């Protein structure tokens, strides 16, 4: 009986890392500087994002971020199964992160699907179905405003079994602590973005983020000309007709 090809752990460990020398075709085919790999990653994310249950009215279509991919690859090269420091995965905004380890070179689609499958342990609007359920990879993957993704992979030969390390970073970051159980707005697909819809996903993304949780009320009271809003509420003030 053949051994299962993939084993995934979400534990803390430090693994020495050596990059592939190019002799392993299965690994080489996963390197994310290749356009076909980037397309696979983007297409898989968008396929899953538009298939959420319940459906989402404000789910943004994802795009590839070269900057996020560079950061993800740098972290993957360290072969450590812990999340990177938030400051190390910033682009123009804060970025979230999903990690995956495999005993064999799984496809990117399989890695991404494994994150999405955490939805089986998640109830929309409520949260994890049990105290020990891990759902943060799923909620980040389907976080409505995370529209940029970049990924990297490393080969870690000194690890006994989990030799393949996958990292994806998402910008702007999802999993807001105050709204983590509602990763998107429930409703008819694209209802929140009339005129900006492609295959059930919104395309009116915002390149900025708010650094305060009460930007909308501050806008109503102080106006976007106030220095505080200029610095801390760029999305609210510059993306009126966009999703953020």
UniProtKB/Swiss-Prot annotation:
Entry superkingdom: Eukaryota
Listed Gene3D superfamilies: CAP, Crisp domain
Domain ShKT: 206-239
CDD domains: CAP_CRISP
InterPro entries for this protein: Allrgn_V5/Tpx1_CS, CAP_dom, CAP_sf, Crisp-like_dom, CRISP-related, Cysteine_rich_secretory, SCP_CRISP, ShKT_dom
Signal peptide extent: 1-21
Key words of the record: Disulfide bond, Secreted, Signal
Residue span(s) of domain SCP: 43-170
Compartments where located: Secreted
Tissue: Testis.
Main location class: secreted
Gene Ontology cellular component list: extracellular region
Disulfide bridges in this chain: 190-197, 193-202, 206-239, 215-233, 224-237
Complex and partners: Interacts with NSUN4 isoform 3.
Biological role: May regulate some ion channels' activity and thereby regulate calcium fluxes during sperm capacitation.
Family: Belongs to the CRISP family.
Name the UniProt record assigns to this protein: Cysteine-rich secretory protein 2
């Amino acid at each position: 009986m053949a051994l299962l090809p993939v084993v995934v752990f979400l534990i803390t460990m430090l693994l020495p890392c050596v990059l592939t020398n190019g002799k392993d075709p299965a690994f080489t085919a996963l390197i994310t500087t290749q356009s076909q790999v980037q397309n696979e990653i983007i297409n898989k994310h968008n396929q899953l994002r538009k298939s959420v249950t319940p459906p989402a009215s404000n789910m943004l279509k994802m795009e590839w971020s070269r900057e996020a991919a560079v950061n993800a690859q740098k972290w993957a090269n360290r072969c450590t199964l812990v999340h990177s420091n938030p400051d190390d995965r910033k682009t123009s905004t804060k970025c979230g992160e999903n990690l995956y380890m495999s005993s064999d070179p799984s496809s990117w689609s399989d890695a991404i699907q494994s994150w999405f499958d955490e939805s089986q342990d998640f109830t929309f609007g409520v949260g994890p179905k049990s105290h020990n359920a891990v759902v943060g990879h799923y909620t980040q993957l389907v976080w409505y405003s995370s529209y940029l993704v970049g990924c990297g992979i490393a080969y870690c030969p000194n690890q006994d079994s989990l030799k393949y390390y996958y990292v994806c970073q998402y910008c702007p970051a999802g999993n807001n602590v105050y709204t983590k159980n509602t990763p998107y707005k429930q409703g008819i697909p694209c209802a929140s973005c009339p005129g900006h819809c492609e295959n059930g996903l919104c395309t009116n993304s915002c390149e900025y983020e708010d650094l305060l949780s009460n930007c909308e009320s501050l806008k109503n009271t102080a106006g976007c000309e106030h220095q505080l809003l200029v610095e801390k509420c760029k999305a609210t003030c510059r993306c009126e007709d966009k999703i953020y």
